[in-house]
Amino acid sequence: MDSVKIALQYIMPKHLVSRLVGKFAAAKAGALTQAFINWFIKQYKVDMSEAAQSDPKAYASFNDFFTRALKDGIRPLCQEDGIMVHPVDGAVSQRGPIEAGQIVQAKGHHYSSVALLGGDEKDAARFDNGDFATIYLAPKDYHRIHMPITGTLSKMIYVPGELFSVNPLTAQNVPGLFARNERVVAIFETQVGPLAMVLVGATIVASIETVWAGTVTPPAGKQVFTWEYPTTGSDALTLEKGAEMGRFKLGSTVVMLFAQDAIDTFAAGVDPGETTRMGQKFANLNKSK
């Protein structure tokens, strides 16, 4: 059965399906939208008690529901000094060292940091011998993405690609999954060096947004688009630890890359299969940096 599911991933018109789902998710279709939201909540056991607006009827579109805000204070930031916090609610897929420019996707599967970042070897070299973490956001999860550490935006890269589903089954069976799927890369300058936050698209992920650019929708095609931003002066964009940096309209995966020696140790519980909550302790920073 798993082999059939993987085969369907290759032959399904994923971009077409995603566009159609995106149109429906954005539509304000009244009773139809409400019925689908109610079904989704029941099917995926969404905890609406955490939402700032807990009444499903308050959401005019499925996108409004899916990108819902949480109640104030429901995800308090860990206040310890010298740490990073979890950027999302989700589950740790993999984490560990970046060795010889390779990142672990699943047992026996690796992909390159160069490919993940859109082919720029200079960008990838900034993370040589650093660390990575991959976090999967399930349908029930809160789908806004926050900063694990204060950072100043220096670059954004849009990388076109496939839209394979992103889940443990495809991670085990689709080579180079995260470096093949459509994605948006945001690179920040932090107190411990560069941080890359890679927002990976997937089947039926209608769009990816950032707080500075809105929905990232370059023209269709195979071209990689890059935007560079000032890191000093009045035009620099600095986002504080815990601030929202983006969101998925329908969910997927976040891959983070850290510079060499940025992280001293990962926090307890930051292991494959463990669930995460935005704002909890993620890692101890290297105090020597």
Swiss-Prot record:
<keyword id="KW-0865">Zymogen</keyword>
<feature type="modified residue" description="Pyruvic acid (Ser); by autocatalysis">
    <location>
        <position position="252"/>
    </location>
</feature>
<comment type="pathway">
    <text>Phospholipid metabolism; phosphatidylethanolamine biosynthesis; phosphatidylethanolamine from CDP-diacylglycerol: step 2/2.</text>
</comment>
<keyword id="KW-0210">Decarboxylase</keyword>
<feature type="active site" description="Charge relay system; for autoendoproteolytic cleavage activity">
    <location>
        <position position="252"/>
    </location>
</feature>
<feature type="active site" description="Charge relay system; for autoendoproteolytic cleavage activity">
    <location>
        <position position="146"/>
    </location>
</feature>
<keyword id="KW-0444">Lipid biosynthesis</keyword>
<keyword id="KW-0472">Membrane</keyword>
<dbReference type="GO" id="GO:0006646">
    <property type="term" value="P:phosphatidylethanolamine biosynthetic process"/>
</dbReference>
<dbReference type="InterPro" id="IPR033178">
    <property type="entry name" value="PSD_type1_pro"/>
</dbReference>
<keyword id="KW-0443">Lipid metabolism</keyword>
<dbReference type="GO" id="GO:0004609">
    <property type="term" value="F:phosphatidylserine decarboxylase activity"/>
</dbReference>
<keyword id="KW-0456">Lyase</keyword>
<feature type="site" description="Cleavage (non-hydrolytic); by autocatalysis">
    <location>
        <begin position="251"/>
        <end position="252"/>
    </location>
</feature>
<comment type="function">
    <text>Catalyzes the formation of phosphatidylethanolamine (PtdEtn) from phosphatidylserine (PtdSer).</text>
</comment>
<keyword id="KW-0670">Pyruvate</keyword>
<keyword id="KW-1208">Phospholipid metabolism</keyword>
<dbReference type="InterPro" id="IPR003817">
    <property type="entry name" value="PS_Dcarbxylase"/>
</dbReference>
<dbReference type="GO" id="GO:0005886">
    <property type="term" value="C:plasma membrane"/>
</dbReference>
<dbReference type="Pfam" id="PF02666">
    <property type="entry name" value="PS_Dcarbxylase"/>
</dbReference>
<keyword id="KW-1003">Cell membrane</keyword>
<dbReference type="InterPro" id="IPR033177">
    <property type="entry name" value="PSD-B"/>
</dbReference>
<keyword id="KW-0594">Phospholipid biosynthesis</keyword>
<protein>
    <recommendedName>
        <fullName>Phosphatidylserine decarboxylase proenzyme</fullName>
        <ecNumber>4.1.1.65</ecNumber>
    </recommendedName>
</protein>
<comment type="similarity">
    <text>Belongs to the phosphatidylserine decarboxylase family. PSD-B subfamily. Prokaryotic type I sub-subfamily.</text>
</comment>
<feature type="active site" description="Schiff-base intermediate with substrate; via pyruvic acid; for decarboxylase activity">
    <location>
        <position position="252"/>
    </location>
</feature>
<feature type="active site" description="Charge relay system; for autoendoproteolytic cleavage activity">
    <location>
        <position position="89"/>
    </location>
</feature>
<comment type="subunit">
    <text>Heterodimer of a large membrane-associated beta subunit and a small pyruvoyl-containing alpha subunit.</text>
</comment>
